[in-house]
Amino acid sequence: MADPWNRGHGAVDDMLDAENKRMAENLASKVSRLKSLAYDIDKDAEEQNAYLDGMDSNFLSATGLLTGSVKRFSTMVRSGRDNRKILCYVSVGLVVAFFLLYYLVSRMQN
């Protein structure tokens, strides 16, 4: 005669095996989503680093340009009274150019 307990253990084992497979598939899908997320974060970080490196070189070139302009302006200021009139014209011209550019940029944004 067949033992009724053995049949019960087989059903429990099958049920536990099916639940383990379901949980393993669930875990595998979560791991795959986490891998995808980690890859996206890594790719985004690399893109941002490249962007920041480009900004660094742009700032360095702007710094060099401004340094040269300040040196030339300082030389003109120290050169004497003859250039005071030119210095005033250049200063007024720079202020006017700044406001003109500001007006044009604000006009283009609207």
Curated annotation (Swiss-Prot):
Component of a SNARE complex consisting of stx5, ykt6, gosr2 and bet1l. Coiled coil: none annotated. One of its GO terms (cellular component) is Golgi membrane. Its main location: Golgi. GO terms for molecular function: SNAP receptor activity. InterPro entries: BET1_SNARE, T_SNARE_dom. Residues 14-76 form the t-SNARE coiled-coil homology domain. It is found in: Golgi apparatus membrane. The chain crosses the membrane at residues 86-106. One of its GO terms (biological process) is regulation of retrograde vesicle-mediated transport, Golgi to ER. PROSITE patterns: T_SNARE. It is a single-pass type IV membrane protein. Keywords: Coiled coil, Golgi apparatus, Membrane, Protein transport, Transmembrane, Transmembrane helix, Transport. The lineage of its organism: Eukaryota, Metazoa, Chordata, Craniata, Vertebrata. This is BET1-like protein. Vesicle SNARE required for targeting and fusion of retrograde transport vesicles with the Golgi complex. Required for the integrity of the Golgi complex. PANTHER family: GOLGI SNARE BET1-RELATED. Residues 107-110 are lumenal. The keyword Membrane applies. The keyword Transport applies. Residues 1-85 are cytoplasmic. It comes from Danio rerio.
